[in-house]
């Protein structure tokens, strides 16, 4: 009997998929796409990273393409006009996120603002987070934390290189910097203490943090063929449950620590930064049913995933590109020396006076957007894009990678040319440059991210001389997990600039 039921379920699922794939609603005018196969749909066309495969298919079939992966329907867009239509006329329709096995298990039941359904709850949580963490006032109060943490990294690198030029694992140091900045602003503690940051203990801590927060949790075969999920295919879901338990334990520990400090009667100077957890707990006292610990943990999770590795990746790619383009590096150094001199370190108030630095960051994000496929959206009702019918429940992919490298939009798109941004008002360029997303679900932390990246990159170029390690092949190959990372971590030979010995010695 059990075998019959299993066979019946499998037969029904296959029949349903076959019907959807080969007998769609003939009245619908779906976007073009490649030939499909029974059951699997278009999965056989995805032989590289998804963003690269979609870019290749878009070159062949146009900037709006329709795909089916098993039982799920997808539309991928890569032209500014199609992207604009998605997030203006259809903005509310695409304001939701798709559900998947990963989001079922890893988002605290969809209550964080990145994955919560569009509506009043989402608006309240997002608005609260923006006001308490990303507002101009809050960024001003947290500025000392970012400046102290970059000084800590400079101090650590100087200790290693002050006697002679040494090889530096730059990815490690920028990751320590971004994690410590986020940890201090959210939880009033360090991820890695300075004395541990350059030794094995610090490296083990960073390895554990990456395992907790950056395990690949994209859609998988169980999302396309739900029958595999019922049978626990390859233990994928159980591994996600185990990962969630690790995350939950870590994040709950942060919340409990701040709660204990708060109950101890600690009084903060009104002008100093208040941690995000402390802000949430203050509101939890007034409305415990809304501001639950799970809500706090869900927001912390989003911050760690979206705010640490993305910034670190941008810094690492920028340094890699600068080492490959020494003329650009020298031009940036001249700008920094002219505006700041050699008597003090760069600080955040200097950033608006360094336009070429911002051009370099923009060009880095154009070539290597930290998230090449923006977080997916899902249509809440039938709609149209570029005259094509998009059914309700279709998952939307916005391919920033393809848009940023489109030769119709950019001259010599494969080349690193920061000067292309010198006379460009990015805000007026429409939808051709979208490294932080677009629409109602755009990243609220753009300003903080730019400050963090600008400060670190400016300080590295101001204080140290950098050279490519001879035996290290400086290439631009990449590895796509949650973010677009370098396939090989950047190692560079580093030595303090002679004029900055006095300043670095006094840090």
UniProtKB/Swiss-Prot annotation:
Signal peptide: 1-22
Glycosylation sites: 347, 362, 475
Pfam families, sorted: p450 (PF00067)
Keyword Iron included in the entry's annotation: yes
Main enzyme class: oxidoreductase
PANTHER family in the cross-refs: CYTOCHROME P450 82C3-RELATED, CYTOCHROME P450, FAMILY 81, SUBFAMILY K, POLYPEPTIDE 1-RELATED
Protein name, UniProt field: Cytochrome P450 81C13
